[in-house]
Structures are given as C-alpha cells and as structure tokens.
Amino acid sequence: MIPNSTTIILTLSLLIWLSPFISKLIRMPIPPVEIILGSLFAYFGFIYDNPYFDLVAQTGFLYLMFLAGMEVDLKQLINSPRVIIHKSLLFLFILSILAMISGWMFELNNIIIISMPLISVGLLATLSKTYDKNESWITLAFTAGILGEVLSITALTIFDAASKTGFNIHLLIEVGYLAGFIVSVFILYKLLKILFWWFPELKHSLMPRIDTANQDIRLAMALFFIFIAIMLSLKLELALGSFIAGMAISAFFHHQKALEEKMSSLGFGFLVPIFFIHVGSSFDIKSLLAEGVVSGALTITVIMITIRIIASFVLRGIYKSKDALLTAFALSMPLTLLIAVATIGDEAELITHLEYYQLVLASIFEVLISMSAIKILHRRYIAPSISQ
C-alpha cells in the first residue's frame, strides 16, 4: 500500500456516500456535485495524486462507457427509420460546420475547434438512470450520440496518433487498425446473430434465466475486460472497446432483464462516482484566479451548447421541438473526450496551459449547465405530460 493512502480512501468513501444527500439538498444532479466536491477536497489536500486513485477512476470511466453501451438497443438502432439516421448525420455535419465558423469568428486555437463538435454518450447512461430511457428525447440522443461517439473517437484516435507521430505512414497504420477493428466487430456481430438464430439455447446456456452462480455478471465483466485488452493490444481508444462490449451484451442477451440493473448498481454506486470525483480533482481551483481562464471557459461552453441547440433544429421534424432541445443539451457533455483532447494537446504543446485549463473548466461547466437545464426542461415540459 502506498504511504498516506488512508486519507484519500476515507475521503472518497465519504464523498461517494454523501453526494446523493448533498445533491438533494442543493437540488443539483449528482455528477456535477461529485465533480465540485472532488475539486474542493483536492484544493484542501484531502485528495491528491495517487496511482490507485487514477487507475480506479480510469476503470470508472470505461465502466461508464460500458453501461452506456448496454443502454443501446442495437436492433432498434439498425432498424431505425432512415429519416432519423439521415437527420442525425445532418445534425453532426451542421455541428462540425458551426464549430469551424465559431472558431474562426472567435480566433480560437485549432485544438479547441477540433474539440467543439465532439460527442460522448457516457453521461447519457446517467440520464437514462435518472429519467425513463424509453422517453423519445433519450432515444433520439442515443441514436445521434452513438454515431457521434464513433466519429468522435475516430477523430480522437487520429488526433492522438498525429500529435505523436505526425502525418506519416504510422498514422495510416493507426487508422487502418481502427477501421479493421470496426469492420471485424460488424462481421462478428453478423456471425453471432446467425449462430444464435440457429442455436437459441446457446444464449441461455451462457446466461441462464435461473442463475445461482452469477454467470451473467461473470460473462459481462469478461467481455468488458476482453475488449479493453483488445484495444490495448491495438493501441486504440479504450472507451470504444468498453462501449462495444456493452452493446454486445445488450444485443445478444436482452433476455436477462435484471443484468442491466445489477451492472448499473455497481457502476453508479461505486466506480462512476470515483471517476467524477477524479475529474473534479484534476482541476486546480487556483487557476480560477488566472486571467482569462473563467472567461475563456465560459466562451467555449456557450459556443459548444449554442451550436448544438442550433444544429438540433434539423431534429425537430422527428419528434417535438422540446425533444430536440433536450437532445441538444444531452449531447452537450463530451466531458471525457474534451479532457482527453486537452490532455493530448497539452502534452504535445499544441495548446498553452491557459487553454488547457479553459478546456477542462469548460467540460465541467457544460455538465453543470446541461444537466441543470435538462432537469428544468424535463420538469416543466415532459413530467406533466407523463403524469397525465
């Protein structure tokens, strides 16, 4: 055990336990509360650099992506009306164009412009936990979010490789690995679909309905770590592997209705809170006093949320306007990908320390604003119609 680990263990234990109570007290969603608490307790020295903490937090992030994958109904996604797929792709295209225009208007760093249209579905898992995952806006957010997530991780992989090797043959190899992996997963999905169609009892053998040995959890965790190992060996983004592992569970073992609840309880009760606390602890509160940090972060936040709201106008024809607006806010929280881009840019010296803190703070602001906006909009427009 690393010396002085007692303090951080006790602190994390208390924060995980107390976060829901504080959330209810100040009427703020739990993830932003955990981020703020992480930042405050790091400032006062109760949370500090610790390799175990970093490892568990990274696992928490990957597990969050795994849970997000489990929320995806792949069959429903594949069979989605073409209008939804087309408008989701149009939403992402408009988002990218608006990001470039905004970056040019405000004379932003190219790295910041790259980060603006990023989409991550990680926090959608927390939203589907809080609200009914069958609500139309969450379904729409997942459809557009999955497409955006794949494109964003592809862009992040290319950016990461380019920052290390430059634009050369090594970059093409990295992109080839990624393309090969995605194609292989698609082929494997088709083969397994045929296999389980011919031998349906095989699914029940792997995950029996009456299970006294927790085979469902064992298989789910095995897939989780197997996909992470594959991504590690290919040197690709781990989040994509964990997300696909979750989708595989949802696609082939949907008969196990209780599994999602079991996995979700472990994630949102332990691993995911540690990840959010770690995000908060990574931000130095002292940097708030530096000139340009808060104003720059607010500028980035406002631009990123605004361009998503504008782009969501193309989604209004699918459902109601309020669903499109809620979808825009739900996709305005690329927390982990934004921090990943900031970290890569800082390590490669492509952005200044000021811009690094702006991006990290903007990622936190986006979660605070978007989750609060969703809560207000849902209470005002969605909840009354559900109760009627």
Pin down the residues of each PLM region.
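Structural signal for the N-terminal portions of transmembrane helices
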Residues: 5-10, 59-60, 142-149, 165-181, ...
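Entry/N-cap segments of selected transmembrane alpha helices
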Residues: 5-20, 73-111, 167-185, 283-317, ...
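Core mid-bundle transmembrane helix pairs that form the ion/substrate translocation pathway
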Residues: 9-18, 150, 157, 161-253
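C-terminal ends of transmembrane helices
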Residues: 14-26, 65-79, 122-135, 140, ...
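Membrane-interface junctions of multi-pass transporters
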Residues: 25-26, 40-83, 204-298
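Juxtamembrane helix-boundary/capping and inter-helix hinge elements in multi-pass membrane proteins
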Residues: 28, 70-82, 104-109, 127-139, ...
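Hydrophobic alpha-helical transmembrane segments in multi-pass integral membrane proteins
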Residues: 47, 98-102, 151-166, 223-236, ...
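Short helical (or helix-break) motifs at transmembrane helix termini and adjacent helical loops
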Residues: 116-141, 148-155, 307-313, 334-344, ...
